[in-house]
Amino acid sequence: MNMNDPIASLLGGWSIELNLYSVLLRVAVSVVFAAIIGCERASKRHAAGQRTFILVSLASTVAMMLDKSFAGTSMPLISAAAVIAIAIISSNSILYSSKNQIKGLTTSVALWTCGIIGLTIGAGLYTVSVIGYAALICCLALFPTFEIDLKNRSNHFEVHLELKNREDLQ
């Protein structure tokens, strides 16, 4: 089934099937990827840290492996429920500041993406997992400096106004 996956082909047939060694590999990869992503978020003092990312990824990986073990069912119900649960959990990291600015949106999306990567690891799609993980790390670690550089070179600027009452708008 996953023999088209280059990493699974390198590892061998045991990594595709659900056995003790493939379960250990999938859990280990899931924890390591999530720990690195969580470390990056925690180092910037964001709402969700390393443990949160590890737990979300681990739950997703286990949910997908459970779905794969119930091969007779037509729909992956446990992993679908995991996606919904992760969306609910990640939405709790979004806050509105006193200046009506949204805080935590990137962390929320990163948490959800980490859960999706956990699902791909649980499915045994190692190449997809590595590519998704690399893209997520690039977005979280490299793009902020690129974004700041673009803003500094831009001729546009932001103005924030606070008014005491509506009559001041006239």
Regions found by a protein language model. Give the residues of each.
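Alpha-helical transmembrane segments and their membrane-interface boundaries
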Residues: 1-78
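Canonical alpha-helical transmembrane segment with a positive-inside/aromatic-interface signature
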Residues: 100, 124-170
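Structural signal for membrane-spanning alpha-helices in multi-pass inner-membrane proteins
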Residues: 34, 38, 64-68, 92, ...
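Hydrophobic alpha-helical transmembrane segments of small proteolipidic membrane proteins, enriched
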Residues: 12-14, 18, 22-23, 27, ...
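Ligand-binding beta-strand-loop-alpha-helix segment within the catalytic cores
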Residues: 77-89
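Small-residue-rich segments of transmembrane alpha-helices in multi-pass membrane proteins
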Residues: 55-65, 86-89, 108-121, 166
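C-terminal ends of transmembrane helices
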Residues: 33-46, 89-102, 145
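Membrane-interface helix caps and helix-loop-helix hairpins in membrane proteins
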Residues: 43-46, 70-75, 97-101, 122-127
